[in-house]
């Protein structure tokens, strides 16, 4: 018992130290828009555009890629070894939702709007339109995944019914031995459970990875080192909680808790955001001058929609659902956790 308590305390201390370090890094300095005169910062000139794609900035993005990979993977496999406190996961997920929401509206949308103002005199709300596009694309992906899940479930039920009919017909035509009947009765339900669990796990990973790729692109197209670190803090906070929740869900969906399958699924989820970072780096490296500014403005607009959808529909509305009653599972506590996340981003944006 004492050993278990020591492990819990040490794990919580590690989590607190990690979040504190990321918060300090996020507050150490930021790029972005200026005081609101409609002019774009460094990326507006060719000389500064070459600086944006400097080796130092790329190195920072690579570090962000590695950090996301390592900590997300560690969070995904951690439930196999350690039982997390459900109240901590519940409120932590809501806090991450507030950080996501604040980042989308106060950082991504502001940067996209400011950059568009410096690129064109057209008064059309490009950034807000792209936000709607990003939101709807993410919603469409969820609908497609849900449709595939329903179809797979329906196919499993129909196959089960057909199999039962065949068994009844065979029973009428021939007399099976008692051992064969028991084997047939036991084998099929077990296979159905394993199949449905496997399909649910795959769909869960696909949904999480799709969103994570677009989140990683936000880091890859960052215009400065400080902006890359800030995006890492925002996305990493969400990814760690999501990875832990995913690991817990996988262990519940896979009856025998195979360590190898947990590692494979966690690695797939961990790789998704670094893939997005790599895509963002490639986009940023291949675009120059005004093309780079257009790419950045469009990417930030789309990322705003993705972040808003994930924050509202995945984290706030669904979030982490504890499997045992907990005192923290109350609307007021959830609201305060989201409020704290938004407040943290509001304070961080003072130094933007």
From Swiss-Prot:
Residues 1-29 form the signal peptide. The lineage of its organism: Eukaryota, Viridiplantae, Streptophyta, Embryophyta, Tracheophyta. Belongs to the ZIP transporter (TC 2.A.5) family. Residues 78-87, 149-200, 252-262, 318-330 are cytoplasmic. The gene is ZIP1. GO terms for molecular function: zinc ion transmembrane transporter activity. Residues 30-56, 109-127, 222-230, 284-296, 352 are extracellular. It is a multi-pass membrane protein. It comes from Oryza sativa subsp. japonica (Rice). PANTHER family: ZINC/IRON TRANSPORTER, ZRT (ZRT), IRT- (IRT-) LIKE PROTEIN TRANSPORTER. GO terms for biological process: zinc ion transmembrane transport; zinc ion transport. Zinc transporter that may mediate zinc uptake from the rhizosphere. May also transport other divalent cations. Expressed in vascular bundles of roots and leaves. InterPro entries: ZIP. This is Zinc transporter 1.
